[in-house]
Amino acid sequence: MAGRTYRRRFLLLGGVCLLLLLGSMLVGRYGLSAGKLLHMLWARLTGGAADWSVSDEKVVFAIRLPRIAAAALVGAALAVSGTAYQGMFRNPMVSPDILGASTGAGFGAALAILLGAGYFGISLSAFCFGLLAVAAAWLVSRLSRSDPTVALILAGMMISSLFSAGTSFIKLVADTQQQLPAITYWLMGSLSAIKAEDVRFLVLPVAVGLLPLFLLRWRMNLLTVGEEEAQSMGVRTGALRLVVILCATLLTAASVAVSGMIGWVGLVIPHFCRMLFGYDYRRLIPAAALFGAAFLLAVDDIARLVTTGELPLGILTAFVGAPLFLYLIITGGRRHEH
């Protein structure tokens, strides 16, 4: 019975995600009918004649499609990353930035903007510094003789603080006319400048990060029972933790490199997935990917609809995510009382 319920929920979530993918193609100031959109997509898939205007071609395939693909990939990546980190650390308050990937990426982007790099250079710098931040946290934690998990969290907090201070210093010395506004806007997160090249940049690291987590999701259940219990079952917990950290970091760094710093997705979505699909990571990982993609697609649609000048996604996810998280805290407390 429970298995049938979960299957229905997966089908519903997948259907919502598909509807949002198609519906998002219609959102924007440039008017486009659903029939025309479906005709264009079908013709492109089947190699049919392109009997539409140049404007339609540009809006659908050069502007909206890359943006929607990026929103789905970033949402899925951040949600799965948060789910993996929360399971590994056995802490529901953990977010994808726990080890400094987001702040490291933010520093890398700010540095690239300060040095006058182009759009791809900014993304590449953000990606590399995101990975560097987590690598530094991991190396520092290995030097500690205290509990490995606690040492890793503390090292991540320290590295994150250092990169945050570095970003603040860059903002202090940046040109106030061009560089400072560019840094500030990038740090707030947005998909408004996404191009097809960004999606191609994003696909590989997201795929490399998602695939091992998907294949090892049943082993991740064993991490939640504790270190000694997992080892007694024959699980090499050290190697498994390292793989989870590498994959989750890759997902976070790649997402932030393309979209900027978008918070709350990796913190809130795993909670909703546990409410709907339980604590089994065999269901949680794919559910988080679908839920995260749907959530960021919806938020990005709101960003395009609310004002003529788009709101940064980081602001909107905070406006939406914070009340939802507060609701989860209150209802969770009531469930424990009863």
Describe these PLM feature segments:
Residues 1-338:
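Alpha-helical transmembrane segments in inner-membrane proteins
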